[in-house]
């Protein structure tokens, strides 16, 4: 079986070799753990973001920069294509590990989750578990992890601290924006899973999403980065669905973000109105704007949702001068 941590370790080695070009900073802690700063104190940028996205996906997707038409503005975007959608997106990329140690907090994603089984139920559902001596993690945080954080991660992953490798970028950074937009395919799969769809029938995935500019602090950027997927994220999935076509159509109708009661305005406004309490925001909003599914069994293709660039432009706060 594919080891996402082994695949990720090769990407880390590339990042170490090209650190100066990527504008990242590498730190070796006393424990021997490797920390790669992609935007906390280091400058980082688009290429660092591309490497972060590769890490998150266990290097099991083809990633390319592209452009997206936002009402006449050619905007940077990222394309994602994978023939291993469950392992790449759910076993690796999904940000399913909230790491809180002392005053440190970050969202953990990437290969190391498959060692710690974060969360266990998901790995049982897709039938995947990794076994590798190195733990590779991507942290979305505005702080660099210290020895206590490394020790916590090593313990949960069953590896030695010296074999922990962490790449870090805050939400409010170009690298952070890139890796979040690269979650467009994963976001759709997660929404499918949340409405009771058997995600094991998904054979491949493709998606494209614009990349948010840095619009403010981490909370404000959390709004704009999510909006890239919510309002202009577009995904295509190839599935082999064993049920009736009408049942598949019903699932596809429920996936796009347009089905959410909170749809229609920049996410930061919704989040602020909810007193910045995620539990008061409709989870159904976290989905691509448009979803298309090609079913290999029926050979039919179904599409639902739409793109809303005007809301994304509002979220970005672009001023024409």
Swiss-Prot record:
Species this chain originates from: Methanosarcina acetivorans (strain ATCC 35395 / DSM 2834 / JCM 12185 / C2A)
Catalysed reactions, semicolon-separated: 5,10-methenyl-5,6,7,8-tetrahydromethanopterin + H2O = N(5)-formyl-5,6,7,8-tetrahydromethanopterin + H(+)
Functional pathway: One-carbon metabolism; methanogenesis from CO(2); 5,10-methenyl-5,6,7,8-tetrahydromethanopterin from CO(2): step 3/3
Origin superkingdom: Archaea
Chain's gene name: mch
Role, per record: Catalyzes the reversible interconversion of 5-formyl-H(4)MPT to methenyl-H(4)MPT(+).
Classification via InterPro entries: METHMP_CycHdrlase
Protein's name in the database: Methenyltetrahydromethanopterin cyclohydrolase
Pfam families the UniProt entry points to: MCH
A GO biological process held by the record: methanogenesis, from carbon dioxide
Cell compartments where the protein resides: Cytoplasm
Ranges in a coiled coil: none
Taxonomic placement: Archaea, Methanobacteriati, Methanobacteriota, Stenosarchaea group, Methanomicrobia
């Amino acid at each position: 079986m594919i080891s996402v941590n082994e695949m990720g370790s090769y990407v880390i080695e590339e990042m170490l070799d090209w650190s100066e070009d990527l504008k990242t900073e590498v730190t070796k802690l006393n424990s021997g753990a490797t920390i790669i700063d992609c935007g906390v104190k280091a400058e980082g940028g688009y290429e660092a973001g591309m490497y972060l996205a590769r890490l998150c996906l266990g290097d099991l997707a083809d990633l390319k920069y592209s452009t997206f038409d936002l009402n006449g503005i050619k905007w940077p975007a990222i394309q994602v294509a994978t023939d291993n959608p469950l392992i790449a997106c759910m076993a690796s990329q999904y940000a399913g590990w909230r790491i809180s140690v002392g005053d440190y907090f970050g969202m953990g994603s990437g290969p190391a989750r498959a060692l710690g089984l974060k969360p266990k139920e998901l790995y049982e559902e897709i039938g995947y578990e990794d076994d590798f001596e190195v733990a590779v993690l991507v942290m979305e945080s505005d702080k660099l992890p210290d020895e206590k954080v490394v020790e916590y991660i090593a313990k949960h992953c069953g590896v030695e601290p010296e074999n922990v490798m962490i790449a870090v970028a805050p939400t409010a950074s170009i690298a952070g924006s890139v890796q979040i937009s690269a979650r467009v395919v994963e976001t759709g799969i997660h929404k499918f899973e949340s409405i009771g769809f058997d995600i094991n029938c998904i054979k491949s995935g493709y998606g494209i999403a614009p990349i948010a500019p840095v619009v403010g602090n981490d909370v404000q950027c959390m709004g704009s980065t999510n909006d890239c997927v919510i309002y202009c994220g577009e995904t295509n999935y190839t599935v082999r669905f064993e049920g009736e076509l009408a049942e598949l159509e019903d699932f596809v109708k429920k996936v796009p973000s347009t089905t959410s009661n909170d749809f229609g305005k920049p996410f930061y406004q919704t989040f602020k109105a909810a007193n910045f309490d995620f539990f008061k925001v409709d989870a159904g909003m976290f989905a691509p704007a448009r979803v298309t599914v090609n079913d290999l069994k029926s050979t039919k293709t179904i599409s639902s949702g739409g793109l809303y660039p005007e809301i994304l432009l509002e979220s970005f706060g672009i001023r024409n001068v």
